[in-house]
Amino acid sequence: MAKEPMRVLVTGAAGQIGYALVPMIARGVMLGADQPVILHMLDIPPAAEALNGVKMELVDAAFPLLKGVVATTDVVEACTGVNVAVMVGGFPRKEGMERKDVMSKNVSIYKSQASALEAHAAPNCKVLVVANPANTNALILKEFAPSIPEKNVTCLTRLDHNRALGQISERLNVQVSDVKNVIIWGNHSSSQYPDVNHATVKTSTGEKPVRELVSDDEWLNGEFITTVQQRGAAIIKARKFSSALSAASSACDHIRDWVLGTPEGTFVSMGVYSDGSYGVPSGLIYSFPVTCSGGEWKIVQGLPIDEFSRKKMDATAQELTEEKTLAYSCLE
């Protein structure tokens, strides 16, 4: 029996990440090789022509799973009936801009998109915010779409999670698919805490702790952390654009694991609404280790936290609290 198509919204769809993301969705990377999709692409009026070009290319690619394409600058049309919303559109920080200016622009974007999703998306729509500041944009969206369950509003920290996996696999010269259970705690910013204390590597003699195999705490507590924290900036420096294909790929990973479930014994990082777990203040969107099954995520409980980790986790929570205050001051 063929599945009913799922409607997937991508905002900012004419941009760099959007251009990398829509073919992945149309190929079944996000929702599975047997799941037909209808793509809803939204962008701002100045990008309308470019957006139409992307639509033409999607038609030209003749993707078997792609059952329709909506390309629009109208937020209501874009949000109508969507089952998954990937929010890539936002206002990027330009040179010389204050953080508050960027924040107020994004607050107004996410406030209006929240209202449109709330009124027009399918019931139980799953939302993933990618645009920076991702955690706080997601928080604003959640606040202004009260009828969307809070568990359905998430932000992307899977990119940071995958970056951490990549660094470990390079350091140990192992397959990245054999490394698991790194954690990104906190904000999708340079204050995030990439934690390897619970991470393992599959070896010929079973699973071994990453810390034991690397056996260089100075690197793990120093350069490893800063490399992951600063990776986005390093890519901008090298490519002159921010990371697009890796962001698109990790957005697919995030939604796929959320919808289809995580493998047994594996956890991933997602920015989710805090319930006070691990002493993180509730009322923040904070990255936690989670497992997913039946379309629901659950925070992994009971992991021991050492003093070094505690400080880092608190520092990134503090930054998120400050961002939240700044965002709310933009609403007044």
Swiss-Prot record:
Keywords tagged on the record: Cell membrane, Membrane, NAD, Oxidoreductase, Tricarboxylic acid cycle
How this chain sits in the membrane, per its record, is: Peripheral membrane protein
Which Pfam families would you find in this protein's record?
A: Ldh_1_C (PF02866), Ldh_1_N (PF00056)
- Catalysed reactions, semicolon-separated: (S)-malate + NAD(+) = oxaloacetate + NADH + H(+)
Which example biological process does GO assign this protein?
oxaloacetate metabolic process
Name the InterPro entries on file: L-lactate/malate_DH, Lactate/malate_DH_C, Lactate/malate_DH_N, Lactate_DH/Glyco_Ohase_4_C, Malate_DH_AS, Malate_DH_NAD-dep_euk, Malate_DH_type2, NAD(P)-bd_dom_sf
Q: In which tissues is it expressed?
A: Expressed constitutively in roots.
Which PROSITE patterns does the UniProt entry name for this protein? MDH (PS00068)
Q: Where in the cell is it found?
A: Cell membrane
Q: In terms of pH, how does activity behave?
A: Optimum pH is 7.41 for the native enzyme.
List ligand-binding residues for NAD(+): Q16, I17, D43, G90, Q113, N132
Q: Name one GO cellular component term.
A: plasma membrane
Molecular function GO terms recorded: L-malate dehydrogenase (NAD+) activity
Binding locations of oxaloacetate? R99, N132, R163, H188, S243
Which residue positions are annotated as catalytic?
H188
EC id: 1.1.1.37
Q: Which protein family is named in the record?
A: Belongs to the LDH/MDH superfamily. MDH type 2 family.
What is known about its subunit structure?
A: Monomer.
What's this protein's function? Malate dehydrogenase; catalyzes a reversible NAD-dependent dehydrogenase reaction involved in central metabolism and redox homeostasis.
Name assigned to this protein = Malate dehydrogenase, cytoplasmic
